[in-house]
Amino acid sequence: MISSSDALVVAASGGIGTAMVRTMLNDTSLERIFAVSSVPEAPQEFNNNSKLTWMHCDYSAMDIARTVNRLLSLECNLVMGAICNGILHDDAVKPEKRMDDITEESLNRVFTANAVVPILWIKELKQVFSKRDICKIAILSARVGSISDNRLGGWY
């Protein structure tokens, strides 16, 4: 019988995700924290924490489904979650400060990371939402600009 109150952090190795994991580990109402990351190993600060299960995922639809199936096998009773993956820019995607900077490839990469992947998580996670409690999920997108960029007109 499922009796735990569990939480999930997707993109747990990023700055916001790591902070969410730290906060959830200190929450005594949560029994287990499942941290998902594209980084295979948990940061050293989380080693030997019996409350935490670190899970590797490449964020493809197939791997998201595999990860959720693992949560099901662990009888996850999800009451709280944070989906923190998203990109503002990376080596391949630069901020579009002019209309001419926009490319199909960069838009596809940004939309996939910030919109498609979170919805794929929700689609699969509905199977592990708590049956007895309300499950609260936050989706945090990285697609925001700095205040100084906004004063200059922002990004596209």
Predicted feature descriptions by range:
Residues L25-Q44:
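Conserved glycine-rich Rossmann-like NAD(P)H-binding loop of the short-chain dehydrogenase/reductase
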Residues V68-N69, I122:
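Short-chain dehydrogenase/reductase
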Residues D27, E75, E124-D133:
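A short helix-coil junction within the Rossmann-fold of NAD(P)-dependent oxidoreductases
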Residues R70-D90:
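A glycine-rich helix->loop->beta "capping" turn
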Residues N47-D63:
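Rossmann-fold cofactor-recognition segment
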Residues A12-N26:
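N-terminal Rossmann NAD(P)H-binding glycine-rich loop of SDR-like oxidoreductase domains
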Residues I87-D91, P95-A115, I119, I134-Y156:
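Catalytic loop of short-chain dehydrogenase/reductase
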